[in-house]
């Protein structure tokens, strides 16, 4: 319609307005007139109705106008004094009208001389698909364009716009492409649309197509042939805005971008508010670079013709062709990359064998990479369909995306996501959930997410997961019941969970591992993990590729124990002299140090026990107690096995430390005459060495000395020769970690001798006896 190009009613004179109409239609001023009862209509080519502000072609009408009104098509029913006629409204979509009024769209390169006219202005406007409707031959219902087959119009429009204006850029000959606009409606077509580089273009710059609709549910393009692609695009850019595609037959694919076998990529394309509904494969990207998809909507994914073939929502396929400029089909070309999705919606799979978001490359040498998804949701509405599948990909990132595997309950679990041979895959602030609920757990169950192959650096950061064990307390809290990495080359090292929650939001957030490296060549790595015993383990490795299992070097148990396979160096980073200590708070009051190991600045080692009341000092040449004549080494029931010394034992024998000093009385020596020397084997030695190999020992027997003294009427307890201890039965005791502090001890008693005192009595007895013999000899 051109009424928008004329002057607004009443704003200018009739002559000015008539002149505007004449210029826009390429007519003479005298061939245009205002419609009234005072004109002879057959003397003009077009008339302007000031009531409707529309222009009409006079055609074969004759006579003086009497009455007129618009019909439902917007044409004018005119009655003259001669007859009644239908005057067609002037519209560029009607080629017959355009021809009759002397105007038809011209490409800008053919009409530069008239660019200052209204016709030139119209030539620079977007191309409407309605301009090509006259090419349509299949019109089952003439009055319903939604029944027409628009294939001829679509093909003609694409062919027409691709060379709209010649341009020279970067020493290349290219052609500017005029956007094609679609009004609201459903446009059926039986053959796929094909977009590719205009043949007469040279250089690397691509032909850039743009299709604009009135909204993805208002403007709908519908392929109607079984197995048909809605469109294919190769070696070009294609922009889609506010337009929808709806499957009109079985086994169809929405969009195919790039070739899978030849270097014919789609590049720098931008889609905004674009929908695909009902296709077996929504969008297939064979070779795609540097493109953005904003608010795309892919839904109602249907079955492939063979249900063994996978249906897809959006899929990045394997490229098997050569690199740019190559000829060998070896898959050596760069794969799809630099792709951005903003708020995508991919949902509702009517096919069980379906993947909503797929990226699979030929191998890890040529991976799909640099794919970023911001927000959106990927929702199956079918518990058997996968939300995502990634294979041979690098640097694929999801930010705030919801992955929801929902639908009618099933009695087993199906994969929500699958990752194979991928590197640097990041899920940041995502939600990965299933609505399926199982009543029991089995180690053979399929877990929601599978990581396999040589996958590394799969990061789940601040995600929330819901698995089928939502109601099973034992199995609803950790990643091991949600993520299966048993067949990954580096097992659990293939992925990292950071600050994630599982099932209920009230469960504690979980971080599975922390790895810290030096900043140079990163070959010195400390890794923090928690093992199945609840120990915090610090391990170390010089490997940068997980080829060597890290060595555990330090651990902290869940009861506070510290374990290490190395040394502890206290104060090594302190340049100021001073004591360093380890304190033990063991009585439970959290304030009193019950024992301490301390080293002073001179190197003396202090061991304090019993709240500091007992202390031993390891000096430069002696081990000493801090209080004299108080502490013992061993006890009657817990003796020291052997004591190895170079010099004889020195004991205190200072007169100043003794009282009631006197000679050994004869009654003791008289009794000692009956003390025997004996030889024996130790029972403990027999238990270890056997009766034959156990050695003989000689000396005194405590009980025999006791009997000798008692038989002589002496109280053995008046003398320090014999010691006696007894004890009651005591059970084994343990610390809080289950370690034995003291073993079980049966009830018992023991007699012991102070051997040097016994020998002193023996020598006194022998001396007295010698003295008596000498005196006898002297007589």
Curated annotation (Swiss-Prot):
Gene Ontology BP annotations: adhesion receptor-mediated virion attachment to host cell; proteolysis; symbiont entry into host cell via disruption of host cell envelope; symbiont entry into host cell via disruption of host cell glycocalyx
Database matches in PROSITE patterns: ICA
Keywords linked to the UniProt accession: Degradation of host capsule during virus entry, Degradation of host cell envelope components during virus entry, Host-virus interaction, Hydrolase, Lyase, Protease, Viral attachment to host adhesion receptor, Viral attachment to host cell, Viral tail fiber protein, Viral tail protein, Virion, Virus entry into host cell
GO cellular component: virus tail, fiber
Annotated site residue numbers, Cleavage: 653-654
Pfam families, alphabetized: Peptidase_S74
Protein name (Swiss-Prot/TrEMBL): Probable tail spike protein
Native organism: Klebsiella phage K64-1
Gene label: S2-3
């Amino acid at each position: 319609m051109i009424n928008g190009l004329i002057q607004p009613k009443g704003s200018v004179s009739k002559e000015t307005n008539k002149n505007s109409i004449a210029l826009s239609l390429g007519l003479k001023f005298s061939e245009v007139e205002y419609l009234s009862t005072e004109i002879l209509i057959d003397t003009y080519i077009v008339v302007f109705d000031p009531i409707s502000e529309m222009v009409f072609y006079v055609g074969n009408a004759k006579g003086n106008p009497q009455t007129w009104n618009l019909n439902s098509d917007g044409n004018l029913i005119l009655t003259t004094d001669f007859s009644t006629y239908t005057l067609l409204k002037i519209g560029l979509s009607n080629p017959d009208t355009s021809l009759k009024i002397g105007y038809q769209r011209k490409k800008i390169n053919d009409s530069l001389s008239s660019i200052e006219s209204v016709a030139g202005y119209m030539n620079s406007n977007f191309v409407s698909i309605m301009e090509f409707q006259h090419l349509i031959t299949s019109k089952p219902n003439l009055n319903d364009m939604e029944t027409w087959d628009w294939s001829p119009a679509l093909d003609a429009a694409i062919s027409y716009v691709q060379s709209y204006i010649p341009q020279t850029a970067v020493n290349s000959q290219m052609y500017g492409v005029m956007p094609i606009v679609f009004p609201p409606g459903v446009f059926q077509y039986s053959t796929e649309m094909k977009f590719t580089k205009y043949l007469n273009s040279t250089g690397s710059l691509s032909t850039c197509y743009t299709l604009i609709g009135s909204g993805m549910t208002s403007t709908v393009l519908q392929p109607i042939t079984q197995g048909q692609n809605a469109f294919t695009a190769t070696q070009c850019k294609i922009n889609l805005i506010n337009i929808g595609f709806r499957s009109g037959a079985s086994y169809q694919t929405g969009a195919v971008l790039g070739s899978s076998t030849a270097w014919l990529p789609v590049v720098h394309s931008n889609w905004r508010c674009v929908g695909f509904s009902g296709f077996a494969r929504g969008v297939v990207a064979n070779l795609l670079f540097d493109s953005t998809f904003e608010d795309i909507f892919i839904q109602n994914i249907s079955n492939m013709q063979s249900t063994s073939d996978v249906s897809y929502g959006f899929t990045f396929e394997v490229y098997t062709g050569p690199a740019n400029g190559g000829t060998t089909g070896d898959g050596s070309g760069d794969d799809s990359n630099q792709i951005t999705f903003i708020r995508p919606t991919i949902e509702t799979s009517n096919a069980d064998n379906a993947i909503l978001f797929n990226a699979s490359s030929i191998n890890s040498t040529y991976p799909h990479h640099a794919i970023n998804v911001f927000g959106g949701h990927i929702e199956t509405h079918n518990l058997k369909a996968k939300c995502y599948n990634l294979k041979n990909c690098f640097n694929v990132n999801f930010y705030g995306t919801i992955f929801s595997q929902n639908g009618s309950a099933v009695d087993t679990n199906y994969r929500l996501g699958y990752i194979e041979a991928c590197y640097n895959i990041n899920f940041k602030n995502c939600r990965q959930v299933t609505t399926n609920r199982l009543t029991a757990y089995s180690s053979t169950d399929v877990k929601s997410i599978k990581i396999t192959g040589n996958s590394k650096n799969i990061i789940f950061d601040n995600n929330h997961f819901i698995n089928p064990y939502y109601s099973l307390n034992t199995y609803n809290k950790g990643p091991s019941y949600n993520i299966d990495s048993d067949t990954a080359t580096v097992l659990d090292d293939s992925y990292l969970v950071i600050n994630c929650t599982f099932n209920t939001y009230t469960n504690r957030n979980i971080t599975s591992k922390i790895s810290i490296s030096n900043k140079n060549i990163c070959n010195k790595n400390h890794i923090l993990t928690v093992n199945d015993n609840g120990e915090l383990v610090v391990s170390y490795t010089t490997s940068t590729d997980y080829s060597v299992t890290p060595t555990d070097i330090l651990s902290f148990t869940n009861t506070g124990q510290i374990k290490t396979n190395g040394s502890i160096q206290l104060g090594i980073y302190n340049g100021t002299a001073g004591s360093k200590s380890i304190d033990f708070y063991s009585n439970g009051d959290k304030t009193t140090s019950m024992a301490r190991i301390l080293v002073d600045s001179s190197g003396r080692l202090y061991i304090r026990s019993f709240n500091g009341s007992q202390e031993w000092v390891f000096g430069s040449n002696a081990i000493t107690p801090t209080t004299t004549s108080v502490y013992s080494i061993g006890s009657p029931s817990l003796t020291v096995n052997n004591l190895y010394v170079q010099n004889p034992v020195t004991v205190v024998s200072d007169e100043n430390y003794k009282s009631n000093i006197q000679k050994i009385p004869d009654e003791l020596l008289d009794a000692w005459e009956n003390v025997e020397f004996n030889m024996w084997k130790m029972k403990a030695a027999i238990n270890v060495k056997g009766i034959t190999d156990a050695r003989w020992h000689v000396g005194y027997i405590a009980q025999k000395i006791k009997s000798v003294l008692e038989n002589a009427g002496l109280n053995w307890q008046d003398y320090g020769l014999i010691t006696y201890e007894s004890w009651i039965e005591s059970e084994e005791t343990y610390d809080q970690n289950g370690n034995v502090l003291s073993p079980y001890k049966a009830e018992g008693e023991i007699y012991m001798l102070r051997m040097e005192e016994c020998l002193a009595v023996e020598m006194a007895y022998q001396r007295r006896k010698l003295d008596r013999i000498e005196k006898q000899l002297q007589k």
